[in-house]
Amino acid sequence: MVNKFLAGRLKKSKGKSFKGSSSKGNSKTVKSNNNDNVVVNAADLKWKPVEIPDTLDDFEGFYGLEEIDGVGVKIVGGQVQFVAHDDTKINGNEDNLDSKDKIEIDEDAPENDLVEFKNMDDMKDGELTDNSQSESEAEAESEAESEEEEEKTGDDEGEDGAEKVDNEVLKTNVFNTDIDLEDITPSDLPEWTEKVGELSFTTLHGLTKLGFNKPTLIQEEAIPMALKGEDIMGKASTGSGKTLAYGIPIIEKLMKSKSNTAPIGLIFTPTRELAKQVTDHLRKIASLIVDKSPHAILSLTGGLSIQKQERLLKYEGSGRIVVATPGRFLELIEKDKTLVERFSQISTLVLDEADRLLQDGHFDEFENILKYLGRESKNRKHNWQTMIFSATFATDLFDKLSHASWKNMKTPSKNENEMEIVLKHLMTKIHFKSKPILIDANPEDKVSSQIKESLIECAATERDLFCYYFVSMYPGKTLIFCNAIDSVKKLTAYLNNLNISCFQIHSSMTQKNRLRNLERYQQQSEKNKILGKPTVLVGSDVAARGLDIPGIQHVIHYHLPRTADVYIHRSGRTARANNEGVSVMICSPEEAMGPLRKLRKTLANKSGKDIIMGKKKWQKTVTMLPIDDTILSQLKERSRLASELADHDLASSSLQKDDTWMKKAAEDLGVDIDSDDEIKDTFLAKNINKKRNKTLGKDQKKVLVAQLNDLLKRPLRKDMRQRYLTGGLVNLADSLVKKRGHDHIIGHEKTDALETLKNKKRK
């Protein structure tokens, strides 16, 4: 037995494994005298493959090494025994420890039954052959049995008929460090290959994994041209798949590249959140590449450690596809001139949400980047492909809605090509290797046809109330946009006081806090979806462009946006990927007089469908959202109390910060500061007095909190007749017993904002 085990071990070491081996027919599990321990043969243990790091190259010729823990080794009478301390270490013996294969140890067995161990050098000629005949037969039987098991379990990938023994020895996951065969399924996407062309297995695998079974219109038109190396200027509505329209051609170039380090694509986005989103999207599509080279696709944005980004760029094979914001990328290449030489060799340059380049003040950093890279590429006589994508390419969209009169605006001309005008403007700033191909996936509609627009008219001081009404009446995932950061903070505190899950995101927050709030918003929305409660994200226009937050049902414009392009991008956060959504404008009388009319005329369909029989239909293209006055009246007192508490919290926090800042500044300067000095400054005095007037005393705050909590405990009712549940037009008792109707408003039917607007249009 000892000789057999050692010979088997020697053979396996020469072959590919670390453990000992014996035939399955003769390997027997043995129950020891100790009830807690089981003596087993080496072949019956659950050996685990040893992962070989890439840094160790060929690991001195060793392959197929296996290990096991929780198993002891004993030498009894010169015989090696493996002792398993628990049953889980034994193959298939967890529930069959008392089977007929187990025998009791006979410690008094005659020593003649044991095979004497001899050194290989001491053996006579022919002795090894004679002694190993039975062993060879047993091993042959073992290999046959194991091959049958492989056929049953389906683990026969890579098996070759001529080398069955070698493949049996190498049945560890030695080569799985590069690719996991179990995760790869055959990709059959006929619509992609027919409409777009031949794509690599990596791309098809990523599309299959994400469930993208067919290309969108912009992808269908842009990808074939991009694969040919043409410069492209693409326009498509929000949520139409523009990221993959330029992402897939870049990944295809990466797959065809002969170099393992040369940069392929450089993608610029206007916001950090959009850069992270694009990076995550590309990493999912190219998951097979990322598994092998984790840093091949990198995001370089501000708000995060620049030292870490510099370190990542130094890894071999890193940064082959870079998604960046212009500010951070410019900072990196100015610090390290070798990066200029490196990224001047890119094959493709992409500008996502490129309409921002038309606005003054947004192009300076990007223009400097183009100068650095362009100068170096010119020396190398190298030209890159340029692709520009956005949802809006019209110069009139960037005019301030509050400035010019809507009456002086020109009606859009049918013969005037907006993209041609924009292209002439861009060609003065960006160097194209040839005239770009213009692709317009939605030439008529500026706002996606999947978005149902609506309007709420109210006083300027009632915006909070109508936001509360909307999220109470139509629970779901809602995104509210404000023009000012102070409004974002106030509305967030206001809704939280009303026990509504609310999160905020704005430019004053650090990048980590923004991303953390987005994650928390997603997690909370999943919980509230089950409970039928609303989840709200309040943001400034930093969240308006490109962010793909799954499942946004409603977008509310707390303030009318300053420009029409911002309205288009805000509304585009809903109705993504062929879904429908609702966009609601809360408009004061002052806004309705000029900015609203100008917005509607700017967004008018240039095909002429909005002008019927001389009437300007564009003035009445927005549906008024129905308001239930009985519900609204019950919310007014709650809204007032929550608003006062929110004002108090913000004013107190602001006063405390101001006081801390003044004291710290005085301490740094070594100056004594007196409260009377603050009053001498007229501006500071007015600001401080304004904040102090909004603060409450401790007792006063407690009273307001108690009153608000008392009101929040009372359920909202559609019918205010509370004496008899069965009275009135609605049988409240029946609705309560059968659990029908609205989750939080007794007597009200379960409503959906999208269906409400659709039904109103039909009427």
Curated annotation (Swiss-Prot):
Q: Which InterPro entries match?
A: DEAD/DEAH_box_helicase_dom, DEAD_box_RNA_helicase, Helicase_ATP-bd, Helicase_C-like, P-loop_NTPase, RNA-helicase_DEAD-box_CS
PANTHER family, alphabetized: ATP-DEPENDENT RNA HELICASE DBPA, ATP-DEPENDENT RNA HELICASE RHLE-RELATED
Q: Does the keyword Hydrolase apply?
A: yes
Enzyme nomenclature, EC number: 3.6.4.13
Output the lineage of the source organism.
Eukaryota, Fungi, Dikarya, Ascomycota, Saccharomycotina
What spans are recorded as compositionally biased (Basic and acidic residues)?
Answer: 115-127
Catalysed reaction per UniProt? ATP + H2O = ADP + phosphate + H(+)
Q: Where does ATP bind?
A: A236, S237, T238, G239, S240, G241, K242, T243
Q: Which GO terms describe its molecular function?
A: ATP binding; ATP hydrolysis activity; RNA binding; RNA helicase activity
Pfam assignment, any one: DEAD
From the UniProt record, give one GO term of the biological process aspect: maturation of 5.8S rRNA from tricistronic rRNA transcript (SSU-rRNA, 5.8S rRNA, LSU-rRNA)
Recite the UniProt keywords alphabetically: ATP-binding, Helicase, Hydrolase, Nucleotide-binding, Nucleus, Ribosome biogenesis, RNA-binding, rRNA processing
Q: Which residues form a coiled coil?
A: none
Tell me which family the UniProt entry assigns to this protein: Belongs to the DEAD box helicase family. DDX24/MAK5 subfamily.
Q: Does the keyword Nucleotide-binding apply?
A: yes
Can you list the GO cellular component terms from the UniProt entry? cytosol; nucleolus
Its protein name is ATP-dependent RNA helicase MAK5
Signal peptide extent: none
Q: What is its main location?
A: nucleus
